[in-house]
Swiss-Prot record:
SUPFAM superfamilies attached to this UniProt entry: ArfGap/RecO-like zinc finger (SSF57863), Nucleic acid-binding proteins (SSF50249)
Gene Ontology BP, a term: DNA recombination
Record-stated family: Belongs to the RecO family.
The keyword DNA damage is assigned to this record: yes
Gene behind the chain: recO
Any GO CC annotation of this UniProt entry: bacterial nucleoid
Keywords, sorted A to Z: DNA damage, DNA recombination, DNA repair
Transmembrane stretches, start-end: none
The name this protein goes by in its record: DNA repair protein RecO
Record keyword DNA repair present: yes
Coiled coil: none
Length: 258
């Protein structure tokens, strides 16, 4: 019996001269790896269908426990074209996919996260800021990793509105009145903390446009990276690539050919 796997291709690796290993995220069985037989052959129906960030229906066999599934054919597939053509958009989309793969075991029903991921890819492909979309995922996935910083109120006085900074010592936000209690608070941009809090509960589908300054985005990313580095111990390969690209842009901001 042939199984139907509906989902999004999030990883493609060479396996043999004619075959590839394809990782697909699906709402019902989560993230799994499949052997795409003959996908590297010129006339294979899977050649185009198994490109990165292609989505649709694939046919083959579900993976057995601790094993590979396989794919023989596909149907009604499409691709997020702009993501596939732009190295930066691709990197942010891959970063989100790597976070999801780290957060969930294989064969896990993750329908909520799957549809959130699909919405994220649509937004990135349509031109919304990929860093902002990735930040929403980074923040909302924290609880899945077992990390839940307090982003809703100052733990000392219960303050929920006003200016805040992030404190490792208090594992969350600290109001301006209590800055003196933590000399090692992050000194983050107050607007970055505002977005940190907002992104913890916003839905991707609510984003139609958003404009955040580069300084605020850098400050927000610094807070998020600190949490992932020190409390989770996770740094994706795509995040490393993004940081390398960002450092080049800072080093050569006006480099152009005439």
């Amino acid at each position: 019996m042939v199984d139907k796997i509906s989902g999004i291709v999030i990883s493609v690796r060479d396996y043999s001269e004619n075959d590839s290993l394809i990782k697909i995220i699906s709402p019902t069985i989560g993230i799994n790896t499949y052997l795409a037989r003959g996908s590297k052959k010129t006339k294979s129906s899977l050649k185009i269908a198994t490109q990165l960030f292609t989505y649709g229906d694939f046919f083959g066999k579900y993976p057995k426990k601790n094993g590979l599934g396989y794919l023989n054919s596909s149907e009604s597939t499409s691709i997020f074209k702009n993501i596939s053509l732009d190295i930066i958009l691709n990197a942010y989309a891959s970063h989100i996919a790597e976070l999801l793969a780290a957060a969930f075991d294989e064969n896990t029903n993750i329908d909520q996260w799957y549809f959130m991921f699909f919405q994220a890819l649509k937004k990135i492909d349509a031109g919304l800021d990929p860093q902002v979309i990735a930040n929403v995922f980074e923040i909302q996935l924290l609880s899945v990793f077992g990390v839940e910083p307090n982003l809703f109120s100052d733990p000392i006085n219960g303050q929920t509105e006003g200016e805040f900074d992030f404190s490792e010592q208090y594992n969350g936000i600290l109001s301006k009145k209590n800055y003196h209690l933590d000399d090692r608070r992050l000194h983050a941009n107050p607007k970055a903390i505002y977005y940190l809090r907002m992104f913890s509960k916003i839905k991707i589908s609510q984003f139609n446009s958003i404009n955040i300054s580069e300084n605020v985005k850098r400050s927000l990313q610094r807070v998020i990276n600190l949490i992932y580095d020190r409390q989770i111990g996770l740094k994706t390969r795509s995040r490393t690539f993004i940081e390398q690209m960002n450092s080049l842009q800072i080093k050569y901001p006006n480099d152009s050919s005439n």
